[in-house]
């Protein structure tokens, strides 16, 4: 993951024990610094991968296998302590984003207020599924007595996506936002696209290539 400024990179790589670990790079001028292992997130974590940093520069999501994992890879969240350059102890974000399967990535597009997470639950070997969701603004505690055990298991495992839609109003608005962003991106791309053939070997693709 590279931040919007293009000067900070988070990535995973094998450490000396052949386990995946998270590292960071800083861009200095035109060059990247030497990789440094992230500090503070290794306690109770055996492997870490698929990092994502929110635009606040402190809220950090990643997938990991560890003592608090439900099964396989789970999504964890931590926050950067800018004073000492370390991260706080990671927390498992829980169900329904985590399951007994591998849950690999959690990303939020703050512009559209739409999130995405990747999992291999109920997928053929070697395949994953990307879910879209509306990021919650707060955690709601539901009365478990109002639901059967089967319903609760279904909610936790997202066995039926339609059960998460409620009245469907927020879902409809989110899809409209996504559609509007897609149209805007297409319009910008088509407006900036230029293919002007100069000769058999030269094609201009930008107006700045023309000189008086």
Language-model regions, residue ranges each:
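Short, conserved micro-motifs composed of acidic
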Residues: 1-211
């Amino acid at each position: 993951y590279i931040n919007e400024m293009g000067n900070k990179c988070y990535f995973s790589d094998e450490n000396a024990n052949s386990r995946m670990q998270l590292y960071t790079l800083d861009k200095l001028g035109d060059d990247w610094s030497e990789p440094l292992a992230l500090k503070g997130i290794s306690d109770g974590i055996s492997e870490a991968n698929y990092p994502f940093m929110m635009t606040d520069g402190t809220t950090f999501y990643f997938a990991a296998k560890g003592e608090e994992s439900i099964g396989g890879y789970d999504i964890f969240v931590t926050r950067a302590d800018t004073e000492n350059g370390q991260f706080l102890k990671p927390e498992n974000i829980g169900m329904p984003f985590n399951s007994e399967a591998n849950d690999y990535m959690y990303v939020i597009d703050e512009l559209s207020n739409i999130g995405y997470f990747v999992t291999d639950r109920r997928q053929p070997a070697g395949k994953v599924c990307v879910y879209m969701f509306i990021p919650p603004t707060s955690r709601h505690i539901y009365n478990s007595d109002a639901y059967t055990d089967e319903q609760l298991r279904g909610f936790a495992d997202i066995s039926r996506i339609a059960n998460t839609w409620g009245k469907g109003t927020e879902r409809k608005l989110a899809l409209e936002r996504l559609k509007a962003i897609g149209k805007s991106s297409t319009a910008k791309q088509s407006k900036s696209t230029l293919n002007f053939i100069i000769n058999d070997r030269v094609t201009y693709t930008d107006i700045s290539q023309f000189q008086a």
